[in-house]
Amino acid sequence: MKYIFAPPANKGLQQLNHALFESSHTLPALKIPAHASGIAMETLRSHILVAPRLRTIVDDPTDKKWRLLLLDPSMEASEINDLPNPLKEFALKHEAKLVKHTIELKYDYWTSDQVLRSILPDEMETPGAFETVGHIAHLNLRDRYQPFKHIIGQVILDKSSHIKTVVNKLDNIDHTFRFFQMEILAGINDMNAKLKEGGCFFHFDFSKVYWNSRLQGEHDRIIKLFGQNDLICDVFAGVGPFALPAAKHKRCVVFANDLNPQSFKYLMENIKLNKLETRILPFNMDGRQFIKQSLEDLNNPAIWNKITKQKPTSNDKKRNRKVESPTVAPLTDQPAISGIRHFKHYVMNLPATAIEFLDAFHGLYSGMRDVIMDSDLPTIHCHCFSNAKDVKADVIERVERVIGMPLGSNLIMVHSVRTVAPNKDMLCISFRLPSALAFAEPKILGKRKGLETEENLVSQSDVSKSSDNILEKDT
């Protein structure tokens, strides 16, 4: 049976002191010949000490020819004859002696959970799993943990070798640009995260953009729905968690947009970092207006050439030389497209408000019924939150209210992404754009203040220049 030691109780401690977590534990032990160690481990397993990160057999400090076999701490015996039969027989056969051995356990031995349990009041649970963003541990502590937040941060920093900075999310959130206000609890003041997800490298300032490592599974799920060389419109792209893997692994051409200038800055940098300039075109504009002009931009030769005129990157050349996988179709620099170009998928990952942007699809294909078939209409993946009892019905009803018509057979699925808080779920509704909505007479949607669409598009040559400037500023 595994034995778990516990550190000394330090209830209410708010400033970390390693010395307060030192403890001594005296255990029964058999002093055995060194050559009998292997036999002892094989035959006495049910009677010896089994504890995390502790050796069962240690050197005898008084004689190198002998070893100390540490026994189950719960065993009560003052002499050999008091031992259970297997131990007694082994001891008599090998002339072993029953002794006491003291082990010293210090702060470094205890896990973060053990340390925090010894500190926090009994009625408080230790904080659950935290999000890791590169070298940053991201906590979301509730109010009752506020008196202990700094010591919690220090313990996590001490016990996680890859963590250099521990931050706590504050209540304030920037609703326009979707990033959280944070405070540093422990470690260095460095919010520039570097990480790898979905086979792509990402770099960004975590304090200025939105990133959630817990959504990697959702990123992967959506990307698996894309086909090779699909045209993708990522309306709220952030720093590229959907756009980059889709371009790299599915060879999709992605129009990726984000309103946050900082997200846009790092999106451009990450495109260059992953050598995906021939696959992703970045935009920095309001999501509603981006949707409204997406089809026009896709069929604008000047805009399309921003990608097609790019020289193939080394990644493109390597991929095009590969013939090892018979399941992957031969790849060209760009998908061969005749007639009207149209996106296969729209991704709308802005859970708090994405549903409100669905009105932008009204009349998107107006006047194109002769050249666009119903089967060509895109699939929309719209992320949202719900705290309703029936979340699926709630999401469907909200979408139908915004688009002004029932989804009917156009509904594909409502996928449960994760529970973000008690009685609050994140979901993704996927549906085909209804033809009645797509081909309707367009509504006039006002542009949001400060939008100048000609300046919102950044060419890939500008991306390279901008990224170079970014790197210079960061050094």
Curated annotation (Swiss-Prot):
It is an enzyme of class 2 (transferase). It is found in: Mitochondrion matrix; Nucleus; Cytoplasm. GO terms for biological process: tRNA N1-guanine methylation. GO terms for cellular component: cytoplasm; mitochondrial matrix; nucleus. The keyword Methyltransferase applies. Keywords: Cytoplasm, Methyltransferase, Mitochondrion, Nucleus, S-adenosyl-L-methionine, Transferase, tRNA processing. InterPro entries: MeTrfase_TRM5/TYW2, SAM-dependent_MTases_sf, TRM5-TYW2-like_MTfase, TRM5/TYW2-like_N, tRNA_Gua_MeTrfase_euk. Residues 456-469 have a biased composition (Polar residues). The keyword Cytoplasm applies. Its EC number is 2.1.1.228. It catalyses: guanosine(37) in tRNA + S-adenosyl-L-methionine = N(1)-methylguanosine(37) in tRNA + S-adenosyl-L-homocysteine + H(+). Belongs to the class I-like SAM-binding methyltransferase superfamily. TRM5/TYW2 family. This is tRNA (guanine(37)-N(1))-methyltransferase. The gene is TRM5.
